Amino acid sequence: KKKQIQRKKGENKVTEKNWNQLTHEEKRAERVKRWLEPPDIPFVSPQAKKDYVARLKRFADAYRMKKPDRVPVDVPFGDLPLKWKGYTLKDAMYNYDLIPQVWNEFMTKFEMDTFPAPAMSVLPGRVYDMVGCHLYKYPGNGLPDNALGFQFAEGEYMMGDEYDALIKDPSDFWVRTYLPRVFTSFGPYRNISPFTSIVELPGGYFANYAVPEMQKTLKTFMEAGEEFLKYSAVVGSCVEEAAKLGIPTPKTGGLDKAPFDTIGDTLRGTQGIMKDIYRHPDKLHIAMDRLADIQIEQAVNACNASGGLLVTFPLHKGADSFMSRKQFEVFYWPSLRKVINGLIDEGLIVFLFAEGSYMERLDMVNEFPKGTV
């Protein structure tokens, strides 16, 4: 459900009921207003608070294609702070205390308009080890200890004849088919019946959780969750420290993807989905449309929960070198366009991060309202 947008004290509230009656421009104005209101931060000085608000406004103006006071500076420096201080990525992945030590010093040395949180650069190594994640190779797990980054391990995690199962019930396919293929810890979920089998007299269903392998899995999940909270607390402390100094970490709705990439990156792999264009075009279209609705809802819910304004899309397989313009128009663009329009309708701003050249199809972005993409 869409959460209420709380205005400043003494003003009216925008409730879920009248939120649905607002235009996308009015919704965006409400989201921008909330985005610019600094939370209860113990700034180190009045100037730090002034800088915090000015920096956020600088980005909000740029996003909406208004002229900012100057060009905003957003430096995606990755794990550069670690290299700067002589540490490896693996050092920080397994010793979280290094993260604030290094990041806090880095941000006091180099002026910036935003603080790129270390969560996107430093994975919680022990969490990934615990759950047996096969989706990434990282230092000490598939890559040398001194590797400079981590690498997504693309694979065929959904077979070409499994489209019907995905379309019928994406959540069930994820839990009982996809996740067991990419996480060792999810293995026991292959053998349980769907949650929709819990209708009446449900007692027998819980026998699934008496199996030793399933109990081991649940224990692993709890331990991984506790470990992630340790990591999250450390990363959060970096964000809080930056905010005190007047450097915001803009709240976003996280990452979203073109449905073609969700299937091509996450499920079928590059070779698989390129074959599907010819072998299963109709089912591919149905699956992408099904996922588009889910992705819109997930991104909107994430922004409502965080107070975020921006949803970032890393665009992969729609690049000029991956497919022709005609293939882009038929397979990549329609479902991506649906997701973008769904987010615009909710007052969100879409950030399309083109990984590769999109010059041959850049003109298509012009169809959206000014200041929304």
Language model: regions and residue ranges:
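Short, Lys/Arg-enriched N-terminal segments with co-localized hydrophobic residues
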Residues: 1-13
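Catalytic cores of TIM-barrel enzymes
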Residues: 13-373
